[in-house]
Amino acid sequence: MQKSNIVEYKGLGRRKSSIARVKLVPGSGKVLVNDRQPENYFPNKLVIQDMMQPLVLTKTAETYDVYVKVIGGGFNGQAGAIRLGITRALIQTREDLKTDLRKAGLVTRDSRVKERKKFGLYGARRAPQFTKR
């Protein structure tokens, strides 16, 4: 089996219940999310801007092709997971980018997840109405 010379950088991102596996390959700036263009995958442009933030911040949007496989969650959670995956892959390319990315708050994983519903309550914290008499 012959090993290829193509360099690729991988990053894993998680947000809420979404998991994104990101692969950066030196190229022309092509982006595919689950084998589709981001404009065809995500419902609005703000989500795409949120997803592309690490590449725009480091001025590497035209340097790498981005291939993403993302599962679970909604569109905002998926965009956040992709953003973290891209950030981690970029740090593998050049370690000096980490300080700029950290200042923008992109390196830290957002660990907030939906709180579970408890029995005896209507939701995670909403209790039945209290009656005094």
Curated annotation (Swiss-Prot):
PROSITE patterns: RIBOSOMAL_S9
Family: Belongs to the universal ribosomal protein uS9 family.
Gene Ontology CC: cytosolic small ribosomal subunit
InterPro entries reported in the protein's UniProt record: Ribosomal_Su5_D2-typ_SF, Ribosomal_uS9, Ribosomal_uS9_bac/plastid, Ribosomal_uS9_CS, Ribsml_uS5_D2-typ_fold_subgr
SS bonds (residue pairs): none
Protein species of origin: Ureaplasma parvum serovar 3 (strain ATCC 700970)
Protein name, UniProt field: Small ribosomal subunit protein uS9
An individual GO BP term: translation
Gene3D superfamilies in alphabetical order: 3.30.230.10
Name of encoding gene: rpsI
Cross-referenced SUPFAM superfamilies: Ribosomal protein S5 domain 2-like
Entries under NCBIfam families matching the protein: PRK00132.1
Keyword terms of this UniProt record: Ribonucleoprotein, Ribosomal protein
Gene Ontology terms, MF aspect: RNA binding; structural constituent of ribosome
Signal peptide: none
